[in-house]
Swiss-Prot record:
The gene is prfA. It holds the Pfam family RF-1. It is found in: Cytoplasm. This is Peptide chain release factor 1. The lineage of its organism: Bacteria, Bacillati, Bacillota, Bacilli, Lactobacillales. Its main location: cytoplasm.
Length: 359
């Protein structure tokens, strides 16, 4: 099937979906209505671009006709030639855009995410930088109109985070933040440094798509659930009723503890969200590691310990090592304005996938 047949098939399906979504039987079936609505939304940009492309093709035909029928009118012929030139340039732009829109979509792109940030090498300074990254993602999420909820946090004594887990919900969250997984390195003078020396520290970020209960086939027998009393500062028990929950996935030994909420039920629900995401991510990583190197993730190696980005404070510089992008905008980026970085990563990924398809 060539690209035009593919595009026509997408448009035909889009029109069919429009009819189905106005069918009373479909509207009354909430689950089916949501599935079809999601499918329609995922095809919308492609259909709009394809319809605009067909109009550009018609503009080329019209301009060629005008040149033929100009009857020696130099001004009319010149105008038609300019219109033809513009339309042909537009045609090339649309063809590239449509190739990208037809690329196989990551099935997780529309999902919410579980975001984990940990202070790694560098002690207190690494934990403080983990807090800076948390703020950066919070502000970026706010600008995107997403919901950002801190689910669990383990702080150190200086206001940094040894570990923090957050849920980010909204439209196409995973598609934009999936490239953030990896080691983020910071170079700056710590507050505690009296000699003014630049120190290097690292925080790690892990982005996992949310896994709905219906998607995850976790056998309850594979889970050990412990209930205990939530503890506050200094280790004292803060609840008379045991509300804290620890869930261990026995086959992988993945463990989640949750005590942020006041009820055992809510802590259990949150812990299960994280455990489903971590277990799915664990097996996804095994599957990816077994793939041929050529078929691995097109950005980086997929290695969680891979250094993906450096934040250099003295030079106000951010460098993404995977795509060779350097921006002298560290302050802007840490304030949540991540669009330039995200857009560059998305474009690079799409370009790599196009090259693979053309091999």
């Amino acid at each position: 099937m060539n690209i035009y047949d593919q595009l026509q098939a997408v448009e035909d399906r889009y029109e069919e979906l429009g009819e189905l979504l106005s069918d009373p039987d479909v509207v009354s079936d909430t689950k089916r209505f949501m599935e079809l609505s999601k499918e329609e939304a995922s095809n919308r940009d492609t259909v709009i671009a394809y319809r605009e492309y067909k109009q550009v093709l018609q503009n080329i035909v019209d301009a060629e006709e005008m040149i033929k029928e100009s009857g020696g009118d130099a001004d009319l012929e010149e105008m038609a030639k300019q219109e033809l030139k513009d339309a042909k340039a537009e045609k090339e732009e649309y063809e590239e855009k449509l190739k990208i829109l037809l690329l196989p979509k990551d099935p997780n792109d529309d999902k919410n995410i579980i975001l984990e940030i940990r202070g790694a090498a560098g002690g207190d300074e690494a934990a403080l930088f983990a807090g800076d990254l948390l703020t950066m993602y919070q502000k970026y999420a706010e600008a995107q109109g997403w919901r950002f909820e801190v689910m669990e946090a383990s702080m150190n004594g200086v206001g940094g985070f040894k570990e923090v887990v957050a849920m980010v919900s909204g439209q196409s969250v995973y598609s934009k933040l999936k490239y953030e997984s990896g080691a983020h390195r910071v170079q700056r003078v710590p507050v505690t440094e009296s000699q003014g020396r630049v120190h290097t520290s690292t925080a790690t970020v892990l982005v996992m798509p949310e896994v709905e209960e219906v998607e995850x086939d976790i056998d309850p027998k594979d889970l050990r659930v412990d209930i205990y009393h939530a503890s506050g500062a200094g280790g004292q028990n803060v609840n008379k009723v045991a509300t804290a929950v620890r869930i261990v996935h026995l086959p992988t030994n993945i463990k989640v503890e949750m005590q942020e909420e006041r009820t055992q039920q809510k802590n259990r629900e949150k812990a299960m969200k994280i455990i489903r995401a971590r277990v799915a991510d664990h097996f996804a990583q095994i599957a990816q590691d077994e793939q041929d190197a050529e078929r691995k993730s097109t950005i980086g190696t997929g290695d969680r310990s891979e250094r993906i980005r450096t934040y250099n404070f003295p030079q106000n510089r951010v460098t993404d090592h995977r795509i060779g992008l350097t921006l002298q905008k560290l302050d802007t980026i840490l304030s949540g304005k991540l669009d330039e970085v995200v857009d560059a990563l998305v474009l690079y990924d799409q370009t790599q996938k196009l090259e693979e398809l053309n091999k």
